[in-house]
């Protein structure tokens, strides 16, 4: 995967899991709880291969000394660090996101936090622009499940903090897992230039629509068929008043 230009900051969303039998992928109606995530159900060997590819791409386009924030459950504490090291990324510490409202799970204790692996590209002194009293516990209210557009949607505030701590206005930010587009919205709010990738075409559409609604602007398609134009045409055909 080729990602350019080089980035001052990288934000990558980790994987999440839910029972495969509950996944009901649909083309017209997109509900995060019904749509499976790409690469969500893979073997340990395949997951290791994917980690090397993902972290390798982050390191390849990240400037030396610049940071990456990688979300992932605590179970990844044994998986991420060795691959980060192999990719030339220094694993500094974890940041704990306290969601303020617990998440119902099948475990004995409800989940109320998520881990972020804070790392930077080796080869230069790392850049940190946050205050001296910044802590590794971020209390940020989670997105209301009724308004979520992606199964692992993160609050925009999380991306805003990462950008303010590790990048300057006008610099580039890369998100290899675009998902709901929270990173793009955070970049708009903080004056950064965001570059997003998303494997699922439907979530690409979600990101574009969310950006258009937030900015009031119209996204321009660089190449290929316009899914929104085709969708509007289908709606016109279904509307007998047109």
Locate predicted features.
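S-adenosyl-L-methionine-dependent nucleic acid methyltransferase catalytic domains
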Residues: 1-103, 107-111, 118-122, 126, ...
């Amino acid at each position: 995967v080729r990602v350019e230009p080089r980035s001052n900051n990288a934000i990558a969303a980790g994987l999440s899991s839910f029972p495969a039998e509950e996944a009901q992928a649909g083309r017209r109606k997109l509900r995060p709880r019904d749509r499976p995530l790409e690469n969500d159900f893979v073997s340990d060997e395949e997951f290791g291969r994917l980690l090397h590819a993902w972290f390798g791409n982050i390191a390849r386009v990240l400037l030396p000394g610049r940071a990456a924030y990688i979300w992932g459950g605590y179970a990844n504490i044994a998986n991420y660090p060795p691959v980060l090291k192999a990719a030339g990324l220094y694993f500094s510490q974890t940041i704990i996101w306290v969601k303020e409202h617990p998440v119902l799970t099948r475990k004995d204790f409800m989940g109320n936090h998520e881990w972020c692996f804070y790392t930077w590209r080796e080869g230069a002194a790392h850049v940190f622009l946050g205050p001296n009293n910044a802590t590794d516990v971020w209390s940020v209210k989670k997105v209301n499940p009724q308004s979520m557009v992606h199964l692992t949607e993160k609050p925009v505030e999380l991306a805003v903090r990462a950008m303010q701590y590790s990048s300057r206005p006008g610099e580039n930010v890369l998100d290899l897992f675009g998902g709901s587009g929270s990173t793009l919205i955070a970049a708009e709010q903080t004056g950064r230039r965001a570059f997003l990738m998303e494997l699922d075409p439907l979530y690409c559409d979600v990101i574009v629509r969310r950006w258009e609604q937030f900015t009031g602007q119209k996204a321009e398609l660089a190449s290929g068929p316009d899914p929104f134009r085709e969708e509007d045409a289908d709606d016109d055909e279904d509307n007998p008043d047109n």
